[in-house]
Amino acid sequence: MVKHMFLEDVNNLISDDKWLIFQNEYNTEVNPRYETLFTLTNGYMGVRGTFEEGSEGERSGNFIAGIFDKSDAQVREIVNAQNWLRIKLYVEGEELSLDKCQLIEFKRILDMKKGILFRSMLIKDSKDRITRIEGYRFISRSDLHRSAIKLFVTPVNYSGVVGIESIIDGTVLNSADSPKHRVKHLKVADNSSLNKSGVYLETATIDDDIRIATGSAVRLYHYEDKEKNNIAKFKRFLPLGEMSIEYFEFDGTENKTVVIDKFIITYTSRDVKKGLLKSTVEKELFAFAGEGIDKELQRHIEVYEELWSVADINIEGDEEADKALRFNIFHLMSSVNENDPMVSIAAKALHGEGYKGHVFWDTEIFMLPFFIYVHPKAAKTLLMYRYNMLDAARKNAALNGYKGAQYPWESADTGEEETPKWGFDYMGNPVRIWTGDLEHHITADIAFAVWEYFRATEDIEFMLNYGAEVIFETARFWVSRCEYVKELDRYEINNVIGPDEFHEHVDNNAYTDYLAKWNIKKGLELINMLKEKYPEHYHAISNKKCLTNEEMEKWKEVEEKIYIPYDKDKKLIEQFEGYFDKKDYVIDKFDENNMPIWPEGVDITKLGDTQLIKQADVVMLMLLLGEEFDEETKRINYEYYEKRTMHKSSLGPSMYAIMGLKVGDHKNAYQSFMRSANVDLVDNQGNTKEGLHAASAGGTWQVVVFGFGGMEIDKEGALNINSWLPEKWDKLSYKVFWKGNLIEVIVTKQEVTVKKLKGKGNIKVKVKGKELTIE
């Protein structure tokens, strides 16, 4: 336990060790990784885990969902907004700098149960004065606009004047550490004092004049003073250009603790009209400061308690896996705003600037299953983002010469294609990025996600009013995307990139072709369902979308004749036409994190000439459409492609773990699971500093529930449980929503127990092939 390091008030807040992630030393080399690990977010805003006082080499970040700007960047990117964390301390004028003073003690703790970041340190300055600083901060999950910092400052061996600078810093940049790419997305619109009781900084984005308004107020008082009387003997407001600063001084007394409460309110012009921003922030700020931090903190903790009551998974017998899984779940469920259907979850969530804050297929295929089964309201909101971007997808299809709706590979706030045209290869050479032009499978991925949500929730209102249109318009795209080859009497999808991005400009990628076929077929099935059960809705949508019998016949023809490169005798699916003709390498060496090492002789600038792949492709297909393939086909393809997958994307290990369990490769499945679970905790991709691997977090949950927990939906739409536990696991328990009912599944080596916790009516579940009725 670590509680001896903290004051009693802080001790009482900290959860048990299984909920805690620790940083035990200050190190500028690894700090950027901890900044990502210790990011706090409520889905509306994410603030990286930098230090209040700042530090050398930090990557500060304050990201607000839905706030994008292009300015001088290649494409629209999430804006790094003004930094409100800053609190600098001075003793008799000398700054207590993490990089210039001596750190005698140091610890930071992320409390995942409560969504709080704790800190404690003992610091000695150049005059040998020792100061203890401890405290915590949180971004409220109850009121999304509220954040707070509480610090306890104790002069250990001196008395003297202590100064405090509370800063809202608008000098922030995107890509600040890269002279080649850094961009300024904000200009200051207002920097002012709030009735001498707080400060206000309002910024505006360069392109669209979106306003971001931040207000902060500081309260100083002695720790023992229950009345919290102000002890500042000097106070000054400094509107220094793009920084809004309050400076305070108080008389520090040896071994007497002073409390610094910093209250922060954030609003944007997405929330309220520009003319009302300042008055809204001021009103909310003083209401918050008047109430105090404790009440908001309690409400915040209660929201997390409610979320964890469904989301928490217990693994008994494997503490490392148990905590790593909890870490992934914490960040995933913290990253969604279930009340805003105009935003989604980016590939790096709100944890960093990686991938420019863009939304990929990661959300629908890797993250969404968690929300479907744990937080269905949030899942619906994420799908509504795609529905709300449907017009942009139609525009995208038309621009590319197709019909229907073609979703962009990278999406931001407008729904238009935001993939950069240029990037860098593994050697740092500039390369053309083709994913935005060619990685079309995302369109089918989104349709697939719509159907998966419907299967699990039976939310017919969503399907009738929103989901059906997405499936129809994406099916229409695929019919126009397919090319008819007369001499072979088949339809092909040529010049694409599949999930494996080592190979570009390929023809008939099996994943893409199969998902396109599925998308068109599902569109036809849905039309028949609507005709039969909801004729009024069918007539409305068919009139709106001009669905004709002639077009439906075309859909049937294309769906039946789409070509899949599949040798049914060998049962081996060729990833794309010509893949087996590439130079073959087999992976046989791994690094200290059990990640593959490039085979000897590989030219990593010409990976497209080899059979090495970046991530799961054919294996991914067999997971999504598992009912289409028999067990032997799955095993043969898993064994072939597993040896050739470099896992240069964090998306791969979780998928190989699930498939490994399905085909009996239990040892490698567990290793793949731990690769996925630890991707950020041990930084096995080497880029955690750029932000959370959010898709891997979702994939990690899938491995435990769909893999070890054995949960799947069969062809008939029934819930199946076919579990398998690793040797060191004694018990696994998880909860999911299934068609409006909350159920708990408890798995041991001896038995599987399924309980209904909430809901009406009986539930039928197949446990290891035996049908049970759960009352």
From Swiss-Prot:
Record annotation: effect of changing K114Q: Retains 85% of kojibiose phosphorylase activity
Effect annotated for changing D177N: No change in kojibiose phosphorylase activity
One Pfam short name: Glyco_hydro_65m
Enzyme class: transferase
Consequence of changing D340N: Retains 90% of kojibiose phosphorylase activity
An annotated Gene Ontology molecular function: kojibiose phosphorylase activity
Temperature dependence: Optimum temperature is about 65 degrees Celsius.
Any GO BP: carbohydrate metabolic process
pH dependence: Optimum pH is 5.5. Stable from pH 5.5 to 9.7.
Record: active site: E501
Inhibition and activation profile: Inhibited by Hg(2+) and Pb(2+).
Listed result of changing D459N: Strong decrease in kojibiose phosphorylase activity. Increases KM for kojibiose, beta-G1P and glucose but minimally affects the value for phosphate
Catalysed reaction equations from the record: kojibiose + phosphate = beta-D-glucose 1-phosphate + D-glucose
EC number: 2.4.1.230
Keywords, alphabetical: Carbohydrate metabolism, Glycosyltransferase, Transferase
Impact when changing R476Q: Retains 50% of kojibiose phosphorylase activity
Outcome, altering R137Q: Retains 60% of kojibiose phosphorylase activity
PANTHER family: GLYCOSYL HYDROLASE-RELATED, PROTEIN-GLUCOSYLGALACTOSYLHYDROXYLYSINE GLUCOSIDASE
Record family assignment: Belongs to the glycosyl hydrolase 65 family.
Primary role: Catalyzes the reversible phosphorolysis of kojibiose into beta-D-glucose 1-phosphate (Glc1P) and D-glucose. Can act with alpha-1,2-oligoglucans, such as selaginose, but more slowly. Inactive when disaccharides with linkages other than alpha-1,2 linkages, such as sophorose, trehalose, neotrehalose, nigerose, laminaribiose, maltose, cellobiose, isomaltose, gentiobiose, sucrose and lactose, are used as substrates. In contrast, shows broad specificity for the reverse reaction. Various monosaccharides and disaccharides having a glucosyl residue at the non-reducing end are effective acceptors.
Quaternary data: Homohexamer.
Protein name according to UniProt: Kojibiose phosphorylase
The species this protein was found in: Thermoanaerobacter brockii (Thermoanaerobium brockii)
